[in-house]
Amino acid sequence: MSAAPPPSIYTESFSTSSNNTTESESINVEETRENILSGFSFEEYFQVSESISVIIKNNFKKIALQLPDYLLWASSELSNKIQNSVPLEYGIKVFILGDTSYGSCCVDEVTSSHLKSDFIIHYGHSCLSPSSKIPVQYVFGKKKNFNVDKFSIELNKLVESKKEENFVIFYDLLYHHNRDSIENLYKNNDNIIVTNINNFNNIYLNNSFKNNKLNETQNCNNNYNNDCCGSDNNNNNNDSGCCGGNNNNNNNNSGCCQSQSQQQQQQNDCCQQKLNNEINNENDNNNEELISGRKIEFKNEKDIKKFNFIWIGEESLTLTNLLMNFNQQMVYRYYIDDNKLLQETLPRNKSLMRRYHISEKCKDASIIGIVVSTLSVQKYSETIDGLKKLIIASGKKPYVFVVGRLNVPKLANFSEIDIYVIVACHENTMVDSKDFYKPIATPFELNLSLRNEKWTGEYITDFGRVFPKLIKDLSFDEDDENKCEIPEDQVEDDQGNIHHFSLVTGRIVIQNKNQSTLQQQQQQQQTQQSGDLISVNNQFKQVSLVGEHLSNKTYKGLDMRIGETPVTTAIEGMSGIPKNYNTDKNNL
């Protein structure tokens, strides 16, 4: 076999810190390679043969390899192995995604779509959030320091001391290759469940991508224009639609290859079936539950709240999320190096109190910024729309920010924002850093505060689970005046202002609850059409509010002092660089 051409390289900024500052670091590749592979061969650790088999089986053409910073040393060798191992007649092209627009745990569908890739191989740690567009294979890596027999001895001691109690075993992704060994030990024990993780995402598993690939190849049997789904030319002999649906009647048009009216009429047939395959994240099977991307298959007891959790691995964001989301349950952690199974004593109460404090700040905020930190997780767009409607219904103003990877300088540019709410994957949704000038809330916290609901101790980091609560009882009709009731701890005066006692500052906070922008536009259009007189009271009220807001600002910009600055002749300034000016005393 002749050597294949070298792979195309596509990389973004290789920043090595969370704030995207580029730092030059010398890396010992051999030492890094030895530490990460930890006794496995290169092919075993990166599962090269499995990836090649999937590529050939599904006839993928453009493959994107997404690697985190700590695995970039393997990018060239990895891409060459895949490129050279697939026969030339398949005509594959391999790209390397060196860094992501957001967190490295999320699949970078944005960059991959720019490359028009049809398959992504995600290496390293993953949040396992459901995707919406492209099939993905997860390669987690491996570690050899876990001994299944030693773990079973410690677990048996715990189970013996806590009879009649149920346990669910979670594990770090690096120990996924040990999962079957653990399952074989406890498959006959109804009180112990071992979670399972699939190495492929939801798009690959439901095979929805195959319909798209089939139709791209067939191009609707070449009987339609190139823009098949938008074409008005219909062929009565074709029973195959662009959405992959089949019509039992060969004389009828099907799928998307119809006129605009026919597309609208049959949207719930072919196209809607494809849509449900892509964005449905709910599990209709009562015997299963999905937690942090891990599937739990229940045996007897089906209430997850009646289980204790066991975590195998080091401290991680996944463990933190389990502790926060299931704060009423016992969580045990197996310390691999010490061979001990101990109850995890993370100060959950303190963390929950901090999150409740941020939730109270949401009530005091007048302007709320929605920070988008993912463009690939399912229902992110619907969640943003729901947050905007909830904020507007509460008499506040929402602004949406897409700033890429989150850091302090980016958000510091928007001083008018009172508080931010972040839409991110469940592992990156809690931002507890004190470096940010304004607090960052989660969709769950914002929904809890703006609806003035009593907090029961429940906490949800996955906005996919928050979304049904977000749109619950929320009117989508902007003309509905009763869509947002005044909470019990707030009072509305004659001018429409809401008086709220802040538990954070201990003061009365006054917020103006004016009509939404959409309502004002609709009323203005109706007034212009009817020719009635226009009231300008609201306009003066808006000007008054803006003036009051500016008067409370401590910094109002540079003072021009026109006509007050004395005129002087030009003088010699400083020369050199900021590190060492020529006019410094040490250089004289």
Curated annotation (Swiss-Prot):
The function of this protein is: Required for the first step of diphthamide biosynthesis, a post-translational modification of histidine which occurs in elongation factor 2. Dph1 and dph2 transfer a 3-amino-3-carboxypropyl (ACP) group from S-adenosyl-L-methionine (SAM) to a histidine residue, the reaction is assisted by a reduction system comprising dph3 and a NADH-dependent reductase. Facilitates the reduction of the catalytic iron-sulfur cluster found in the dph1 subunit.
Question: What family does this belong to?
Answer: Belongs to the DPH1/DPH2 family. DPH2 subfamily.
User: Which segments show compositional bias classed as Low complexity?
Assistant: 11-28
Q: Name one GO cellular component term.
A: 2-(3-amino-3-carboxypropyl)histidine synthase complex
What binding partners and quaternary form does the record give? Component of the 2-(3-amino-3-carboxypropyl)histidine synthase complex composed of dph1, dph2, dph3 and a NADH-dependent reductase.
Binding of [4Fe-4S] cluster, residues: C106, C127, C425
List every stretch annotated Disordered. Answer: 1-28
MF terms in GO: 2-(3-amino-3-carboxypropyl)histidine synthase activity; 4 iron, 4 sulfur cluster binding; metal ion binding
Cofactor-binding details, from the entry: Binds 1 [4Fe-4S] cluster per subunit. The cluster facilitates the reduction of the catalytic iron-sulfur cluster in the dph1 subunit.
- Pathway(s) of this molecule: Protein modification; peptidyl-diphthamide biosynthesis
- Which cofactors must be present for this protein to function? [4Fe-4S] cluster
Q: What is this protein called?
A: 2-(3-amino-3-carboxypropyl)histidine synthase subunit 2
Please give the InterPro entries that the UniProt record associates with this protein.
Answer: DHP2 (IPR010014), DPH1/DPH2 (IPR016435), DPH1/DPH2_1 (IPR042263), DPH1/DPH2_3 (IPR042265)
Q: Which UniProt keywords apply?
A: Iron, Iron-sulfur, Metal-binding
